[in-house]
Amino acid sequence: MNLIPTVIEQTNRGERAYDIYSRLLKDRIIMLGSGVDDNVANSIVAQMLFLQAEDPEKDISLYINSPGGSITAGMAIYDTMQFIKPDVSTICIGMAASMGAFLLTAGAKGKRMALPNSEVMIHQPLGGMQGQAADMEIHARRIIQMREKLNQIMAERSGQPYERIARDTDRDNFMTAEQAKEYGLIDKVIETPTK
């Protein structure tokens, strides 16, 4: 069951009901709270394009709590983040794993953040295939090409040498928010404000 909360807002024309994600979008907040597939990517890309049309000078915030997912779907989000004029700040809440970690690192430099108890996990692309040996070989080569492309982008975005990224993504590599900051995947850990 997928329950989406509704919020009621008072306006000069009366009450207005929004689903929570539409209300957050008014404040230029986009949520990635699931695996990354084509439908999720299309929704996020559309929201980014909409917000750019609304105000190309104002930042967009992308909150990430994702186990990762499809490389091609994630690259659609990544390319859009780099293409649009507004800076996209990224904030890890909970877990940013695999493609979720890649998108976290893709945020505007200086605007990549994580909450103190969140985690980041990087690893090499996963793939499963079946069929004729020749087709499996084609798919294996494609996964290796994608791994090299992702590692190159991660190296550029984190400031780490390509060789270290390749070594550190060979297996699942979990990091605390502070470790992700030291590694260069994010720029700051957001501390809970004191009252």
Swiss-Prot record:
Active site positions, chain numbering: S98 (nucleophile), H123
Catalytic activity reported: Hydrolysis of proteins to small peptides in the presence of ATP and magnesium. alpha-casein is the usual test substrate. In the absence of ATP, only oligopeptides shorter than five residues are hydrolyzed (such as succinyl-Leu-Tyr-|-NHMec, and Leu-Tyr-Leu-|-Tyr-Trp, in which cleavage of the -Tyr-|-Leu- and -Tyr-|-Trp bonds also occurs)
GO cellular component terms attached to this protein's record: cytoplasm; endopeptidase Clp complex
An annotated GO BP: protein quality control for misfolded or incompletely synthesized proteins
InterPro entries, A to Z: ClpP, ClpP/crotonase-like_dom_sf, ClpP/TepA, ClpP_His_AS, ClpP_Ser_AS
Presence of keyword Transmembrane: no
CDD domains associated with the record: S14_ClpP_2
Entry keywords, A to Z: Cytoplasm, Hydrolase, Protease, Serine protease
Major localization class: cytoplasm
Record function comment: Cleaves peptides in various proteins in a process that requires ATP hydrolysis. Has a chymotrypsin-like activity. Plays a major role in the degradation of misfolded proteins. ClpXP2 is involved in the complete degradation of the Site-2 clipped anti-sigma-W factor RsiW. This results in the release of SigW and the transcription activation of the genes under the control of the sigma-W factor.
Name of the protein this chain belongs to: ATP-dependent Clp protease proteolytic subunit 2
